[in-house]
Regions:
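Hydrophobic "anchor" residues
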Residues: 17-19, 146, 336
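Non-transmembrane, aqueous-exposed alpha-helical and coiled segments at domain scale
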Residues: 155-514
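Unchanged
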Residues: 38-64, 71-128, 147-153
Length: 514
């Protein structure tokens, strides 16, 4: 869905507010602020000043941005999304005048004519008149009824996606879905080459990445790799080449302090590590970065010598913190693999995988976070005890849960085929375990997710496969969801029922409507 960027300005003097009565078109008979479309190569501030002068004959000289509104609405029978930069002006040159579009009127702020305004105005206008800066989203039906609304602090524009178990819960699918449905302006990650992320579009195309954010599937989302990333350049180059059609004209912004993996890091891990590992050199590279060794290579050094026209070195923290639009932070691996709070050390990964760590690696504040999506599956997994270099290791158990077979999972679900899963990076068969409710509650305690996403619902009952309607989900799946919510006190808002992007049931508007 394309986004139409607009501005809206309200003139305020002491306890009075200027609203303009529309004379024709979309605004006819409605009171509103004044504004309109942002032209190409025009900033929101420039567009706001221009439109106020055009529509009521004054030029704002002292003003501030107080909000960012998004609307999904119908226009000429088609759904469209409006993104509106909201301003209040306290000083201006000239006197408000009637034009061919509007008739300006002054109101006391306590007498705002909400009955003659758009239905959403009554929700957000009182807040900004009290001095609050807000972000809001409204979903309208064809009759201009508000179906769903979400209003929150303007500075809370960050959503985080984490894995609530030991990885392979379908983060790639959910990040791709969210990036398109929720229209994120920027997506960032701290990934390394020891984990892969998969997304399957509706045409069956499989996108698999270890470095590029999965938000590449949205052509309007800026993508960046932050300072917490540990990069294998060959893999990044391969992904840029393979998905050049998805990237289009976009750059991939990389923080100068992202770490680069060298062959010595892979060699060291193959010679030294005896616990579960992909032997991609990620842990060894991170250790060298922590020790500030002289022979390390950071992204700023590597990419200044090895040119790729798609990569641009940039302070991604500045990029993210200067963005007022929605930001998606894509996590990797899983909380059960966290080096400090994961399962059985040393059968963990080389760093923390919590929401707090992912946010810190992005260079963002926790106070900017609005949502944390924790992705889980009904049967958690661990990697194979057989490595991709021929070694047999102990990849760990699952907090005492019984290890079962993929045949047993299929039997319980009523599926006659084979559910066997293989890891994206090493191509080894995953081990599968019974759900551990105590472990899930522990991971919820660590991360405090606002929402839980349940993927692989078809593993509970195969009749859920490809289901897109909650009402049609088998009772067995609904009962499982109910137990998740009872055990964690966190709503299950998204349900994955298959591999493809369309195999999703999104309950957010139902469960989170405020």
């Amino acid at each position: 869905m394309a986004i139409l960027e607009q501005t809206l300005c309200l003139l305020k003097k002491d306890s009075k507010l200027l609203l303009a009565l529309g004379k024709k078109g979309f605004n006819a008979g409605k009171y509103n602020g004044v504004g309109g479309k942002i032209r190409k190569n025009e900033t929101p501030d420039q567009a706001m000043v221009r439109k106020v002068k055009e529509e009521i004959g004054v030029t704002p000289t002292s003003y501030g941005k107080v909000g960012y509104l998004e609307f999904d609405e119908y226009y000429e029978g088609e759904k469209r999304r409006i993104a509106m930069h909201l301003y209040i002006a306290s000083e201006w040159d000239g006197d408000p005048m009637e034009t061919n579009m509007f008739i300006p009127h002054w109101f006391h702020i306590s007498d705002s004519p909400y009955e003659k305004m758009f239905p959403d105005d009554k929700y957000w206008l009182p807040l900004i008149l009290k001095g609050k800066k807000i972000r809001a989203y409204f979903d309208y039906d064809k009759d201009w009824n508000v179906l769903y609304k979400d209003i929150y602090n303007m500075n809370q524009n960050v959503s985080v996606v984490i894995d609530g178990q030991a990885g392979s819960c379908g983060k790639g699918k959910i990040c791709g879905y969210l990036s398109q449905i929720d229209q994120y302006k920027i997506s960032t990650n701290n990934w390394s080459s020891n984990a892969g992320h998969t997304y399957v579009d509706n045409k069956g195309r499989k996108i698999v990445v270890s470095h590029l954010p999965m938000a590449i599937v949205n052509p309007d989302t800026i993508v960046c790799i932050n300072a917490g990333a540990i990069i294998t350049p060959e893999i990044l180059f391969k992904e840029i080449k393979e998905y050049k059609d998805l990237l289009g004209k976009r750059k991939v912004y990389v923080h100068p302090r992202a770490m680069v993996i060298q062959q010595k890091h892979r060699d060291y891990e193959m010679a030294s590590i005896r616990s579960g590992s992909t032997f991609k050199g990620c842990g060894a590279a991170l250790a060298d970065k922590i020790m500030r060794k002289k022979d390390i290579i950071l992204a700023k050094d590597y990419f200044s010598n090895v040119h790729n026209s798609k990569i641009e070195i940039m302070d991604t923290a500045m990029l993210l913190n200067n963005e007022i639009g929605k930001i998606l932070v894509e996590g990797a691996q899983g909380q059960d693999l966290d080096i400090n709070y994961g399962l059985d050390y040393p059968n963990v990964t080389s760093r923390m995988c919590s929401a707090a760590q992912i946010i810190a690696d992005a260079g963002l504040s926790v106070f900017g976070v609005k949502d944390i999506y924790m992705i889980i599956r009904p049967y958690p997994i661990r990697i194979s005890n057989e490595t991709n270099i021929g070694k047999t290791i102990n990849s760990g158990d699952y907090a005492g849960s019984q290890e079962i077979t993929w045949e047993e999972v299929a039997k319980r679900s009523g599926f006659k085929g084979n559910f066997e899963e293989y890891t994206t990076v090493t191509k080894k068969k995953r081990r599968v375990f019974e759900m551990n409710w105590d472990r899930l509650k522990y991971n919820v305690m660590i991360n405090k997710p606002t929402q839980i996403v349940l993927n692989f619902a078809q593993y509970i009952d195969y009749r859920a496969y490809n289901c897109k309607d909650y009402a049609k989900l088998p009772k067995k799946v609904k009962d499982f969801i109910k137990r998740i919510e009872e055990e964690t006190s966190v709503p299950v808002t998204i349900i994955g029922t298959g591999e493809n992007e369309e195999d999703i049931i999104d309950l957010r508007k139902l469960k989170l409507n405020t």
